[in-house]
């Protein structure tokens, strides 16, 4: 085993030890939430395809649990061409019928139609700003907001930033982008660090 492998192993052991002593955020109590919490939630995303995926998944969650969406995530990727907006924007009636028959996703006609609409609006934003990343991150000044929450009841459902994001996305004809959904998107993509300060991931993502 070379030095890099030893280093990786030591880091993994230390991280596991920390998580055994310092509790995760309480919503991450079982899989698939645990892995998502430890590896993705709150990690800054600047890849446009990744941002589009979270935008669609957060909208799909409306009225459902995030656990439900995580369990369907791979099915969503397959059903929606790996979340490539340029392909989804060209979906027609045949694609909608195909998706409505797909038991691996949320078969809601409004949400499916919204995904197609959002793909078109997403491409328009890319054309205007160069990247969706540049547009979306402008709502937090281009860098993560480092919050210092101590308990889950301290975490808001929306903020002034998510309100502003929601208003502008709606103006650009995006669907399923209310302020609460926008704040969940901000949390997921690392625009805000909402891991509790008692969670080891908070410190890891604060740098």
Residue ranges of each PLM-predicted region?
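HhH-family (HhH-GPD) DNA N-glycosylase catalytic core used in base-excision repair
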Residues: 14-207
């Amino acid at each position: 085993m070379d030095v890099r492998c030893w280093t990786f192993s030591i880091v993994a052991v230390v991280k596991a030890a920390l998580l055994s002593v310092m509790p995760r955020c309480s919503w991450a109590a079982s899989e698939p939430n645990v892995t998502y919490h430890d590896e993705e939630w709150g990690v800054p995303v600047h890849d446009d395809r990744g941002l589009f995926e979270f935008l669609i998944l957060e909208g799909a969650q409306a009225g459902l649990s995030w656990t439900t969406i995580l369990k369907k995530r791979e099915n969503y990727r397959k059903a929606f061409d790996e979340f490539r907006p340029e392909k989804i924007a060209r979906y027609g009636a045949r694609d909608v019928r195909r998706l409505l028959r797909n038991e691996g996703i949320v078969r809601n006609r409004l949400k499916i139609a919204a995904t197609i609409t959002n793909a078109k609006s997403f491409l328009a934003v890319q054309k205007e700003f160069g990247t969706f990343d540049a547009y979306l991150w402008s709502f937090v000044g281009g860098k993560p907001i480092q919050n210092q929450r101590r308990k889950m009841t301290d975490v808001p459902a929306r903020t002034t930033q998510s309100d502003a994001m929601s208003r502008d996305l709606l103006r650009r004809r995006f669907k399923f982008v209310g302020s609460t959904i926008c704040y969940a998107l901000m949390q997921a993509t690392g625009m805000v660090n909402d891991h509790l300060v008692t969670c080891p991931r908070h410190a890891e993502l604060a740098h």
